[in-house]
Amino acid sequence: MCTTFKAAIFDMGGVLFTWNPIVDTQVSLKDLGTIINSETWEQFERGKIEPDDCYHQLGSQIGLPGSEIAATFRQTTGCLRPDARMTSLLRELKGQGVAVYMMTNIPAPDFHQLREMHYEWDLFDGIFASALEGMRKPDLEFYEHVLKQIDTSAAETIFVDDKLENVIAAQAVGMVGLHLTDSLATCMELRQLVGC
């Protein structure tokens, strides 16, 4: 192992998985944006609200039945696909002796649905799903919790996310943060960081 980094933490959606939702729903893209940026959704991602209560509250906010909100997210999660380039990079990192983790904001039902998907889950040394941990990005306590759980210093950890605010939070606790805007460029940057 030639790298000084011991761990790499990756976001899921938009980083390790891509999605092109082809969803048959009454929920507009605008409403979807309103939902995922709401306090109710953030509490759902922290595991603080039961699914039926969350979907009912969100449905009331946009004038649709909660069952329609639930169905939309089941379909959307079903549209996630692993990014082959990033999966290959995970294998490379493991080969370099770097522990690989996933840290994602995700409600429990979506996480359990995702885990049913055929994927190389054994690549991960650990998975931190917000709803199961009771905290979410960009809350600094979530990053500190993960560092404690993986028993690695922030300076020895690389963090990759497609949301800039999450990268800034990782940098605030001392991690090397990479903002993914293009998977090829990010893969190259990661290889440079850990390469011999």
UniProtKB/Swiss-Prot annotation:
The keyword Hydrolase applies. Induction: Expression is regulated by the secondary metabolite regulator cclA. Keywords: Hydrolase. It catalyses: (S,S)-drim-8-en-11-yl phosphate + H2O = (S,S)-drim-8-en-11-ol + phosphate. One of its GO terms (molecular function) is phosphatase activity. Pathway: Secondary metabolite biosynthesis; terpenoid biosynthesis. InterPro entries: HAD-like_sf, HAD-SF_hydro_IA, HAD_sf, PGP-like_dom2. Gene3D superfamilies: HAD superfamily/HAD-like (3.40.50.1000), Putative phosphatase, domain 2 (1.10.150.240). Its EC number is 3.1.3.-. It comes from the Eukaryota. Sesquiterpene phosphatase; part of the gene cluster that mediates the biosynthesis of astellolides, drimane-type sesquiterpene esters that show antimicrobial, anti-inflammatory, and anti-tumor activities. The first step in astellolide biosynthesis is performed by the sesquiterpene cyclase astC that catalyzes the formation of drimanyl pyrophosphate from farnesyl pyrophosphate. Drimanyl pyrophosphate is then dephosphorylated by the sesquiterpene phosphatase astI to produce drimanyl monophosphate which is further dephosphorylated to drim-8-ene-11-ol by atsK. Belongs to the HAD-like hydrolase superfamily. This is Sesquiterpene phosphatase astK. It comes from Aspergillus oryzae (strain ATCC 42149 / RIB 40).
